[in-house]
Amino acid sequence: LAGDGLGKADLTCLENLLKEDPSNKFLSTVLARENQHELCVLARKFPNLMIFGCWWFVNNPSIVEEITRERIELLGLGMIPQHSDARVMDQLIYKWAHSRQIITSILVEKYSILLDSGWKINESEIERDVEKLLSNNFTHFLSS
């Protein structure tokens, strides 16, 4: 299948595409742990890049948590935490179940840090943030 591969990627090619054609929009995810930070930096530098989901082969809960946490810490809500690249329905069901738990856990931790610092958070702000992560980021990215 297109895009299935192993090992660390050279993201220079992606960086060149982003730089040379800022009017084109790119959705990207990478396989190697070693590429995750570099991909986040590219997403901060180039508004025409949206990071989305975790590649099928890194779909272990501990790795999904690590990647999602890193992306939220570097990009805030400016990414799509999970997508379906499931090839059969039963993969989709279990993938979403553990991804949802991970996203929830990370958001609860981040909101707790804000509350501990004296920041006031209301239910509508949490709903807004979740809608961004699970729906609106994608729609906004394509329409901007």
Per-segment meaning from a language model:
Residues 77-78, 94-144:
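Mid-to-C-terminal alpha-helical segments outside catalytic/metal-binding sites
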Residues 27-31, 52-54, 75-96:
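Short acidic/histidine-rich active-site segments
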Residues 6, 60, 123-127:
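Residue-level preference for long, well-ordered alpha-helices that form the structural scaffold
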Residues 50-61:
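His/Asp/Glu-enriched short active-site or ligand-binding loop at hydrolase and phosphoryl-transfer sites
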Residues 1-8, 36-45, 61-68, 89-106:
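Histidine/acidic-residue-rich catalytic or RNA/ligand-binding cores of hydrolases
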Residues 16-20, 41-45, 74, 102-113:
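Alpha-helical structural signal in soluble globular domains
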Residues 1-35:
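Divalent metal-binding pocket/active-site signature
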Residues 20-24, 44-51, 77-78:
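Glycine-enriched alpha-helix->loop->beta-strand junction motifs that scaffold or abut catalytic
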